Amino acid sequence: MKRVGAHVSIAGGVENAPLNAQKIGAKAFAMFTRNQRQWHSAPLTAASIEAFRRNCDEAGFLPEHILPHDSYLINLGAPEADKIEKSRKAFVTEMQRAEALGLTMLNFHPGSHLNLTDEDACLKTIAESVNRSLDATAGVTAVIENTAGQGSNLGWRFEHLARIIELVEDKSRVGVCLDTCHLFASGYDLRTPEAFDATLREFDRVVGLLYLKGMHLNDAKQKLGSKVDRHECLGKGMIGIDAFAHIMRHPALEEIPLILETPNAEGWAEEIAMLYGFTNE
């Protein structure tokens, strides 16, 4: 089964995320576990944790279909000592929050060298950050999201993702989330079934399909290879609807979260229904 959902709001508490996902006909969802634009947040309460787990149970969401995202402030490749320690501490907290909620994955952007060090040094720093977080937690997989290639952010080439995974000690607790807009912006074509399949074969060759834990389904406002991260509603951007129809029929993409991050949240239920219209599910 294809597990399509969206990155839903946690307004009023994390326990509302599964309810918000259920309302739009989702079979998976993503969320933040706290305010993503602040370094510090109040700990999750026992009541919130219990309500979240109960709501997931009642709505039929299993942990493997939920892909929480960490704070945008975290940079696990930061070259400065004070900033990397702050980011690593925050990331461990994010992993612990996911663990407390009974979740098995945490999605993160790999990091940026800020033009202060070279790519490989930054990739080593990112991998060391992941290793430390895995040592400090149990049961949660760190899921690297590919990036669009903007600025000094790494993760826009499959080789970057492969290098991080190579350096992570516990290979059973690292994975990848492929964002379609980011793929397209960084130069990987998806516009036809043939182009999509070629890109997925390249991912399998360089990284390995066994590491694919989820996808973000977004069309792109800018052209192929633009390195501009601007999401568009499905079928209204430069990728086009054929790619997303193909994803829904692709046998390698079963039972992983396929998460919408398209600009119009009001249209998510319609987009989800449209995607399921490409299948018999």
UniProtKB/Swiss-Prot annotation:
Cofactor(s) listed in the protein's UniProt record: Zn(2+)
Binding site for Zn(2+) 2: E145, D179, H216, E261
CDD domains named among the record's database cross-references: AP2Ec
Enzyme Commission numbers on file: 3.1.21.2
Broad class of enzyme this protein falls into: hydrolase
Keywords linked to the UniProt accession: DNA damage, DNA repair, Endonuclease, Hydrolase, Metal-binding, Nuclease, Zinc
Binding note for cofactor: Binds 3 Zn(2+) ions.
Known catalytic reactions: Endonucleolytic cleavage to 5'-phosphooligonucleotide end-products
GO MF terms, alphabetically ordered: deoxyribonuclease IV (phage-T4-induced) activity; DNA binding; DNA-(apurinic or apyrimidinic site) endonuclease activity; phosphoric diester hydrolase activity; zinc ion binding
Record-linked Gene3D superfamilies: Divalent-metal-dependent TIM barrel enzymes
GO biological process annotation, one example: base-excision repair
Binding site for Zn(2+) 1: H69, H109, E145
Taxonomic superkingdom: Bacteria
Coiled-coil ranges from the UniProt annotation: none
Binding site for Zn(2+) 3: H182, D229, H231
Presence of keyword Cell membrane: no
HAMAP family for this protein: Nfo (MF_00152)
Family membership noted in the UniProt record: Belongs to the AP endonuclease 2 family.
Functional description taken from the UniProt entry: Endonuclease IV plays a role in DNA repair. It cleaves phosphodiester bonds at apurinic or apyrimidinic (AP) sites, generating a 3'-hydroxyl group and a 5'-terminal sugar phosphate.
Protein's name in the database: Probable endonuclease 4
Gene name as annotated: nfo
